[in-house]
């Protein structure tokens, strides 16, 4: 018995495939008589576009400007990130690639304020945020962490509590330090519906009990709102 949602693995390993969707039986099919497109349609319940045609990007103005940026290492005396310079512009996705353990994590920590840099500058929308507080950065910057359990969620909090982790202090959600429960619930309900975050008890679901994919969707919803 092989359980997976990865189409390539299913097609390579299985002779027959039974699809469940939302806990209900959808159908059984021989893999030799089907393809990834048909399987994905059965799994999701609608036609799925497996290949995306991308038109050429036309980047705009600089949004994130990083110059001669360095972040110290916790393991040794050398910098984990040393003298890095790059610019990310509006309308583009900039990828920084590398094998795990080669400074990518420390770079993110430095940019988001989780670690103090040892040199260089960071500008966001023209404003120097090199030494800005995390809350100040959060007004213009979103962070979807590589480790959702370590930096993305408080696992023993409810879904609605996690949705306002970075905004609970706003007058929309509190009054003189007292949380406005109805406002938090309404806000969380909206994000859950908009981003199709599935959980057993909706906004009062404990984050730890959710599937990894829905935990990730909750983080994306919070950060992109």
Regions found by a protein language model. Give the residues of each.
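Glycine-rich phosphate-binding loops of nucleotide-dependent enzymes
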Residues: 1-225
């Amino acid at each position: 018995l092989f359980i997976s949602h990865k189409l390539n693995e299913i097609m390579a390993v299985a002779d027959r495939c039974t699809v469940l969707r939302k806990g209900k039986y959808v159908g059984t099919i021989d893999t030799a008589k089907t393809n990834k497109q048909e399987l994905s349609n059965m799994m999701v319940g609608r036609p799925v576009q497996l290949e995306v045609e991308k038109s050429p990007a036309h980047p705009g103005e600089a949004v994130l400007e990083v110059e001669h940026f360095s972040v110290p290492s916790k393991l040794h005396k050398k910098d984990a990130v040393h003298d890095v310079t790059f610019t990310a512009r509006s309308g583009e996705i900039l990828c920084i690639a590398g094998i795990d353990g080669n400074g990518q994590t420390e770079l993110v920590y430095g940019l988001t304020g989780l670690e103090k840099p040892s040199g260089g500058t960071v500008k966001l929308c023209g404003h120097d945020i090199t030494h800005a507080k995390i809350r100040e950065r959060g007004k213009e910057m979103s962070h979807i962490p590589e480790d959702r359990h370590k930096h993305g969620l408080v696992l023993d909090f409810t879904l609605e509590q996690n949705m306002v982790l970075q905004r609970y202090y706003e007058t929309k959600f509190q009054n003189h330090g007292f949380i406005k429960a109805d406002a938090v619930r309404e806000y969380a309900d909206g994000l859950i519906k908009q981003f199709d975050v599935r959980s057993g008890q909706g906004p009062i679901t404990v984050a730890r009990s959710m599937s990894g994919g829905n935990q990730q969707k909750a983080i994306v919803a919070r950060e992109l709102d």
